Design a protein with these regions (language model features):
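Aromatic-enriched
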Residues: 1-4, 11-55
Length: 55
């Protein structure tokens, strides 16, 4: 989860659409179940929100 927070935090500074990160997480963690996907998406979003608020 901490890696997802960090990935989310750098995402505003990369030339990659945020949706691409979300899509990749769904593909990578999808077979582990929806709970795992949701947990990682929430961590990704938390990192993004933090970075955008603290630029």
């Amino acid at each position: 989860s901490s890696n997802m927070v960090m990935l989310g935090a750098v995402s505003p500074f990369l030339s990659i659409p945020f949706e691409a990160f979300e899509e990749s997480i769904r593909k990578i963690f999808g077979r582990k179940g929806e709970e795992e996907v949701d947990k990682n998406l929430q961590a990704l979003e938390a990192g993004r929100v933090f970075a955008e608020k603290n630029r």
